[in-house]
Regions:
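An accessory alpha-helical subdomain
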Residues: 115, 121-213, 224
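Conserved H-loop
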Residues: 332-334
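Conserved lysine of the Walker
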Residues: 36
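Low-complexity basic/metal-binding stretches
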Residues: 362, 366-368, 374-383, 388-436
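Walker B catalytic acidic pair
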Residues: 305-307
Length: 436
């Protein structure tokens, strides 16, 4: 599947953005806090319906604006599709122009695999991140999964509330059986889904990890759950009922599930180095990509947020050369020059995106630099040195993305402008002397 076009309006630090995307590799580079991750976030939002950075949609709206809009055009199984998400007072989702009531209807339309800097800590942090990893993958492939997960969460909250009422208001414990039954009903389905996909990952991850490490390490995954059978689940709830009442929270259930990764027989979480953690997480993500591909019959979209900073130049190139026909979106702080690969390289500056091409052929770059330079020259005329510096600093950022030939052309143009300004300044000074 492919994303062919991305439109953004009033999202994060973007006013308006319209990008026709490459069907292979799209690289967005620039300094920190320029808006690179916001592009990844907008695609993720159109796939999952939620941001991976915040739970509050209001925070996604550009400062001083009251709405945002994202529109993605994509191709899947040789069919064109369009997803639009708008937010003003609340979030509205449109699929092919038709408004949908539940964000769960969005899941599976655009399949993605995302790798963010926080994912490095999947194995180091608590089980919550590992469950989230499974939830994002499964919800894209099994529409009923997100429903079961939401209902389980709702039932869990109700049971916890009743546990507190038993403690404070001395209510009957008999009603807990009702919540226990519902927890089992939804928990059983969630457990089966998770177990199914853990097994699928197990089949893929060892071969993938051997390719990443050169065949030097053996990797295994163990799924840990309180949910093995109906009798066992009820027994654990009964055994921990007194403790649950004291704490006002449910201590057993699929909300406590986890999985452990072993590297050469040792727990990576406990004994793995930082480098080993990185390679294991990379193997997990690539296994996720292969599982989704097997399920839907085509490659999902791969989103890599600041992932390339973890790899040296040679490994970056090798990785991008070996991802097959997957469409990739990469953000990084440095330019990545890839020869003989189908790619678009974009420079992101202050919420503006510039496609890196020959300078002369890209009128947008020329117009932008020219307007910045002319503004700075006018302001330097009025002796606003600070403003002059700020404008030329912006121009310098943009110049760093140009080729040597383009920089040479820009220098000649800039020299001419400065010479013109100097002569104008001298004429003005002579005129002022005459007036005096």
């Amino acid at each position: 599947m492919l994303i062919t076009n991305l439109k953004i309006e009033n999202f994060r630090n973007y006013n308006k953005l319209n990008l026709n995307l490459n069907n292979k590799i799209n690289i967005f580079y620039g300094n920190n806090a320029q808006g690179k991750t916001n592009i990844i976030e907008s695609i993720f939002l159109c796939s999952i319906g939620k941001s991976f950075r915040t739970s509050k949609d209001k925070e996604l709206v550009k400062f001083d604006k009251d709405f945002f809009r994202i529109e993605v055009q994509y191709k899947k199984s040789d069919r064109d599709g369009k997803i639009k998400i708008e937010y003003s007072d609340k979030k509205h989702i449109f699929i092919n122009g038709i408004k949908v009531k539940k964000f769960s209807e969005l899941l599976g339309k655009i399949n993605i695999v995302i790798f963010t800097p926080d994912d490095i800590n999947i194995l180091k942090n608590g089980p919550k991140m590992r469950r989230r990893f499974l939830d994002i993958m499964i919800s894209q492939l099994r529409p009923n999964y997100i429903y079961c997960l939401n209902m389980y969460t709702k039932t869990l909250e109700q049971r916890n509330a009743y546990l507190k009422q038993i403690k404070l208001e001395h209510k009957s414990e008999d009603l807990l059986d009702l919540w226990n039954q519902k927890l089992y009903e939804y928990g059983e389905k969630i457990y089966k889904y998770r177990l199914e996909f853990i097994e699928k990952i197990k089949e893929k991850i060892n071969d993938i990890h051997k390719k990443v490490t050169g065949g030097n390490e053996e990797i295994k995954i163990e799924y840990i759950s309180d949910f093995s059978s109906e009798e066992n689940f009820y027994m654990q709830l009964k055994q921990n009922q007194k403790i649950d009442i004291i704490r006002g929270a449910t201590s057993k259930g699929i909300h406590k599930d986890d999985f452990i990764v072993y590297l050469n027989g040792k727990n990576v979480n406990t004994y793995g180095s930082q480098g080993q953690n990185r390679t294991v997480v990379l193997s997990l993500k690539m296994s996720e990509l292969q599982v989704i591909k097997d399920e839907i019959g085509e490659n999902p979209i791969l989103l890599l947020d600041d992932f390339m900073s973890e790899l040296d130049k040679e490994r970056r190139k090798n990785f991008l050369e070996n991802i097959g026909d997957t469409q990739v979106f990469v953000t990084c702080t440095d330019k990545i020059d890839i020869e003989n690969l189908n790619s678009n390289i974009y420079n992101v500056i202050d919420g503006e995106v510039f496609l890196r091409k020959d300078w002369k052929s890209n009128g947008k770059i020329w117009t932008w630099i020219q307007s910045r330079a002319n503004t700075s020259l006018r302001r330097s005329w009025s002796c606003k040195k600070k403003t002059w510096y700020v404008h030329w600093k912006c121009i310098y950022k943009r110049i760093t993305s140009l080729s040597i030939r383009d920089c040479r052309q820009l220098c000649w143009w800039g020299f001419g402008r400065l010479l013109y300004t100097y002569r104008s300044y001298n004429r003005a000074r002579e005129y002022n002397n005459c007036v005096r």
